[in-house]
């Protein structure tokens, strides 16, 4: 273990922190930290994944108690094959430093063969070498940082243990709506406003469809219904609740209470549209409701009721349907068909062995007859 020359910026661990780190570093890893992969010669290799090593370092040293730095990156070889592919090998030295100034450093290696792109080969080798060097530097601090994986007796015992399967905890997820930012707080209120606007638009659309379907009604009734339906939708949004007196100002409310009359309603801008629509329908014949009902009854009478599909036995179907002819329905086992060619010197009514010469003679006769 080394120490930095400049000790002025270092912060010492407390005695309790050092005792805790010493105990944790002396422990061996459980089966949930160990991973396996296929190694050379058909065997398996146990190793510690990089993300697990970083989590262990944060847990033991603290998230601000350690740091890592790349000391050197050396390209060992770069070869280009005849097929325009690249073989690259890079070695990396990484140093892991604690906040008290103590550090360990080690070398890692990354290689690739037959890579089509040179940049991808460099990227893969540098990342692989840096990760390997980081894990090798961390294992120098103690057994729980991955050094226990080099103990063969420990590996034999730990591989027999089944790792505990931890359930996924949704409470540990960092969600966007839980972060204390103003922009996220504003986004929460937008769905309510959009819902209110959608509800007003939906009511307005339904009122228009209702008026178009009731074209035969007088224009005065349509205008009156339109105003009565549009006023509550515009002045009484679904989020807030108002009484009938809240819809008018104080002066308008006084005039209503004094004269007991409805306030003057402004002329709807859609009156001219309804008048033009009525003028177009004046010359056309209106279909009455009685004619429509009579036409529906006639069509229902003309529709033939189809019985539901059922599965039944052939005998039951023949017994229930009197139109089926029962004559000649029995299967004739020995009936001969003229359309099927059969050998003349073979009895097809019984099962018996056939000699090979008879088959050859029959085949030759059939070929001559077909020609």
Curated annotation (Swiss-Prot):
Interacts with rph51 and rph54. It comes from the Eukaryota. InterPro entries: DNA_recomb/repair_Rad52 (IPR004585), Rad52_fam (IPR041247), Rad52_Rad59_Rad22 (IPR007232), Rad52_Rad59_Rad22_sf (IPR042525). The keyword DNA damage applies. The lineage of its organism: Eukaryota, Fungi, Dikarya, Ascomycota, Taphrinomycotina. Gene3D superfamilies: DNA repair protein Rad52/59/22. Active in the repair of DNA damage and in mating-type switching. Probably involved in the repair of DNA double-strands breaks. Has a role in promoting S phase completion. Belongs to the RAD52 family. GO terms for biological process: DNA recombinase assembly; double-strand break repair via homologous recombination; double-strand break repair via single-strand annealing; mitotic recombination. Signal peptide: none annotated. Residues 346-371 are annotated as: Disordered. Residues 358-371 have a biased composition (Polar residues). This is DNA repair and recombination protein rti1. GO terms for cellular component: nuclear chromosome; nucleus. Keywords: DNA damage, DNA recombination, DNA repair.
